[in-house]
């Protein structure tokens, strides 16, 4: 297949963000490209790298790390010893499981400029996220990067879901129809894989998976873990009613009486006196702590809308937060 069809990270790198998320079709070459890039940086500039997976068992075959990219560097010796990577006899990088990040706190990595975290979004058949996973990655980044400027962490994933601990933690709501969603210090890239998909459909395996859910992810870069049920932008006639603060997120609740629908959105009226929270962690001035939603008119209406199917959510992230909220309210 033509090399130009595969993923090229140069545009993403040009934005120079410290934290980057690349979510692309399976087989498009994300992992391959993000092996080649740090190898080149080491050969040219002596910059080291760290390769991260979530758990130790995922690094069981790390000895094969260089196998697929060795052809790109015929004049260099690429060797793996344990969880260390060597290029031309010099230490170039480390493989680290995120689950043991605490053991790295006392280590120093002054020459590491790139961290690559592969498969940062959990797939259905994989192991769970580790507890406080985003904080674990941030701790690792802090240990490695310290206060240096020319550094970056690149997180790779197949198109599984835009609802994940990382986007929730940083309150990132990407437009899945845009290739680059750029924020102050972070970036989300969703590569266009149309030409790649067209060519891959011509292969025997491509024909096999075409039209299946797996094919939607692998060929079309569709987020197969994200249902569109109840996802709907609020109507122009909807009116703001109240806000709920949950896990640091402020959710605005809107009502369209003509359509008989209620909406949850990030948009809200900051001057409203109707602000509720369910936890003391979120409680602040000018908020009401609600321990039983049945005792509050607004939350009873919200629960009723949810249970009767006339509640809508602005996007996948908002829906995920709201579902956690309803579980907290003991509404299943």
Swiss-Prot record:
It comes from Bacillus phage phi29. SUPFAM superfamilies: P-loop containing nucleoside triphosphate hydrolases. GO terms for molecular function: ATP binding; ATP hydrolysis activity; DNA binding; RNA binding. Residues 1-207 are annotated as: ATPase. It catalyses: ATP + H2O = ADP + phosphate + H(+). The N-terminus contains the ATPase activity and the C-terminus (CTD) binds DNA. The CTD is likely a vestigial nuclease that has lost its hydrolytic capability since Phi-29 is not a concatamer that neads cleavage. ATPase required for the genome encapsidation reaction. Part of the active packaging motor via the binding to the packaging RNA (pRNA), itself fixed to the head-tail connector at the unique portal vertex of the prohead. Binds and supercoils the pre-formed, unit-length DNA bound to gp3 to produce an initiation complex for DNA packaging. Provides the energy to actively pump the viral DNA into the prohead. Approximately one molecule of ATP is used in the packaging of 2 bp of viral DNA. Changing residue 330 to Q: Decreased packaging. Keywords: ATP-binding, DNA-binding, Hydrolase, Late protein, Nucleotide-binding, RNA-binding, Viral genome packaging, Viral release from host cell. ATP binds at residues 24-31. The keyword Cell wall biogenesis/degradation does not apply. GO terms for biological process: viral DNA genome packaging. It comes from the Viruses. The lineage of its organism: Viruses, Duplodnaviria, Heunggongvirae, Uroviricota, Caudoviricetes. This is DNA packaging protein. Belongs to the phi29likevirus gp16 family. It is an enzyme of class 3 (hydrolase).
């Amino acid at each position: 297949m033509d090399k130009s069809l595969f993923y090229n990270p140069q545009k993403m790198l040009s934005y120079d963000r410290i934290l980057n998320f690349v979510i692309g079709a399976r087989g498009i070459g994300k992992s391959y490209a993000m092996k080649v890039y740090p190898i080149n940086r080491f050969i040219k500039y002596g910059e080291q790298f760290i390769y991260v997976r979530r758990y130790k068992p995922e690094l069981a075959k790390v000895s094969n790390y260089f196998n697929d990219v060795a052809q790109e560097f015929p004049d260099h010796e690429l060797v793996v010893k344990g969880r260390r990577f060597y290029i031309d006899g010099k230490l170039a990088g480390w493989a680290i499981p995120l689950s043991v990040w605490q053991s790295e706190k006392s280590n120093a990595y002054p020459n590491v400029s790139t961290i690559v975290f592969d498969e940062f979004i959990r797939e259905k058949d994989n192991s769970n996220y580790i507890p406080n996973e985003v904080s674990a990655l941030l701790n690792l980044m802090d240990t490695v990067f310290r206060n240096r400027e020319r550094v970056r962490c690149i997180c790779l994933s197949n198109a599984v879901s835009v609802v994940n601990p990382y986007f929730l933690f940083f309150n990132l709501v990407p437009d899945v129809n845009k290739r680059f969603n750029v924020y102050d210090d972070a970036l989300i890239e969703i590569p266009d894989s149309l030409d790649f998909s067209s060519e891959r459909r011509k292969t025997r395996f491509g024909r096999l998976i075409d039209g299946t859910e797996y094919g939607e992810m692998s060929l079309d870069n569709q987020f197969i873990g994200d249902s569109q049920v109840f996802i709907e932008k609020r109507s122009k006639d909807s009116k703001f009613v109240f806000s709920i603060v949950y896990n640091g997120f402020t959710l605005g609740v809107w009502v369209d009486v003509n359509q008989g629908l209620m909406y949850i959105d990030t948009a809200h009226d900051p001057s409203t006196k109707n602000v509720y929270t369910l936890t003391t962690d979120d409680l602040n001035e000018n908020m009401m702590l609600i321990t039983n939603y049945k005792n509050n008119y607004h939350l009873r209406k919200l629960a009723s809308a949810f249970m009767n199917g006339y509640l809508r959510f602005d996007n996948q992230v908002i829906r995920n937060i709201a579902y956690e909220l309803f579980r907290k309210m003991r509404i299943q």
